[in-house]
Amino acid sequence: FVTVLGSITDILVTEFGNNFINLSFLRLFRAARLIKLLRQGYTIRILLWTFVQSFKALPYVCLLIAMLFFIYAIIGMQVFGNIGIEEEDDESAITQHNNFRTFFQALMLLFRSATGEAWHEIMLSCLSGKPCDENSGIKEDECGNEFAYFYFVSFIFLCSFLMLNLFVAVI
């Protein structure tokens, strides 16, 4: 009864515009109607309880995803971290902000790849035949690696198919 009375008062104050006092707290009664509805519906309560219980396993799935990103970022830094960045080359997906030089940049590149944004272009930019960075101290001419095929395809497979399905299955 109090919920309905508070909601009606809020609607009347809003409609007639007598805002001489700030009565915005009355909008809480609208939310109270939803809580009252949830108490009455048995099936809605069961559904919400199941949803809340699924949050217990969610941190473990998030930890597994974080471990996958961590491992792939470290491997990417070791294998592809010395690829040179060419300012004038528009075809290369390895840029100043999109590379494996630091751990944070590697994580950002992997997150970008996990979302599906041009991961194949990044993979092709990490293949052999790419020049090394002058500041890396490496005397070799090429810093790319054919390992990029396995690296990116396995990462996309694990992220897109296994982890995403595991995340959705928990929820």
Curated annotation (Swiss-Prot):
Principal location listed in the UniProt entry: membrane
Entry's transmembrane regions: 1-11, 19-37, 57-76, 144-168
Any one Pfam family match given in the protein's UniProt record, by short name: Ion_trans
Catalytic activity of the protein: Ca(2+)(in) = Ca(2+)(out)
Record carries keyword Transport: yes
Gene3D superfamilies, sorted: 1.10.287.70, Voltage-gated potassium channels. Chain C
Keywords, sorted A to Z: Calcium, Calcium channel, Calcium transport, Cell membrane, Disulfide bond, Ion channel, Ion transport, Membrane, Repeat, Transmembrane, Transmembrane helix, Transport, Voltage-gated channel
Positions annotated as IV repeat: 1-171
GO molecular function: high voltage-gated calcium channel activity
Membrane topology value: Multi-pass membrane protein
Keyword S-adenosyl-L-methionine: no
Site features described as Calcium ion selectivity and permeability, chain residue numbers: E117
Subunit structure: Voltage-dependent calcium channels are multisubunit complexes, consisting of alpha-1, alpha-2, beta and delta subunits in a 1:1:1:1 ratio. The channel activity is directed by the pore-forming and voltage-sensitive alpha-1 subunit. In many cases, this subunit is sufficient to generate voltage-sensitive calcium channel activity. The auxiliary subunits beta and alpha-2/delta linked by a disulfide bridge regulate the channel activity.
Biological role stated in the UniProt entry: The isoform alpha-1A gives rise to P and/or Q-type calcium currents. P/Q-type calcium channels belong to the 'high-voltage activated' (HVA) group.
Domain note: Each of the four internal repeats contains five hydrophobic transmembrane segments (S1, S2, S3, S5, S6) and one positively charged transmembrane segment (S4). S4 segments probably represent the voltage-sensor and are characterized by a series of positively charged amino acids at every third position.
The protein, known as: Voltage-dependent P/Q-type calcium channel subunit alpha-1A
Source organism per UniProt: Gallus gallus
